[in-house]
Amino acid sequence: MNLTTLYPFLEERKLRKRVGRGSASGLGCTSGKGNKGQNARSGGGVRPGFEGGQMPLQRRLPKHGFKNAFFKVEYAIFNLDWLTTFFKGKNEILLEDIYSHKLCSVGTPVKILGSGSISNIVTIEAHKFSRSALKKLHEVGGQAKIIEK
């Protein structure tokens, strides 16, 4: 006996509904779809959200807010302590290093946050820094190089 010979008992298996196979089956003739109408047709039924011609909910509710999606900038976010442990022994962390290690895709702007603590003097290159990250870098004598896009 092995895994390929295992099968459930016949009583436990739910049999599929065989429709349109004679009136004695209980699902013959109209195959459980009733008489005529949109739902009786092949591919019949209404799309999700259709309310029978009534103004649907998503159109009754007003538009809200402003979405500036075209100009939205998504930053790749890294914490100071994580970056310094990842690049242990380096005293300069450049954007090329972050991109070459595939920590984020090339061209994605990078923001450094100030979570955790750092002990070694390090120079970090990024597009943005949080106030806490700048404060912690300057406390240990490190530098933050802000890159203009």
From Swiss-Prot:
Has keyword RNA-binding?
Answer: yes
The record, for InterPro entries, names:
Ribosomal_uL15 (IPR030878), Ribosomal_uL15/eL18 (IPR021131), Ribosomal_uL15/eL18_sf (IPR036227), Ribosomal_uL15_bac-type (IPR005749), Ribosomal_uL15_CS (IPR001196)
> Which keywords has UniProt assigned to this entry?
Ribonucleoprotein, Ribosomal protein, RNA-binding, rRNA-binding
Q: Where is the composition biased (Gly residues)?
A: 23-35, 42-52
Q: Which NCBIfam families match?
A: rplO_bact
Q: What is this protein called?
A: Large ribosomal subunit protein uL15
Cite the Pfam families for this sequence.
Ribosomal_L27A
Annotated family: Belongs to the universal ribosomal protein uL15 family.
- What is its quaternary makeup? Part of the 50S ribosomal subunit.
Q: What does this protein do?
A: Binds to the 23S rRNA.
Gene it is expressed from: rplO
Q: Does the keyword NADP apply?
A: no
> Which Gene Ontology molecular-function terms are recorded?
rRNA binding; structural constituent of ribosome
Region: Disordered; residue ranges are: 21-54
- Which cellular components does GO assign to this protein? cytosolic large ribosomal subunit
Q: Which GO terms describe its biological process?
A: translation
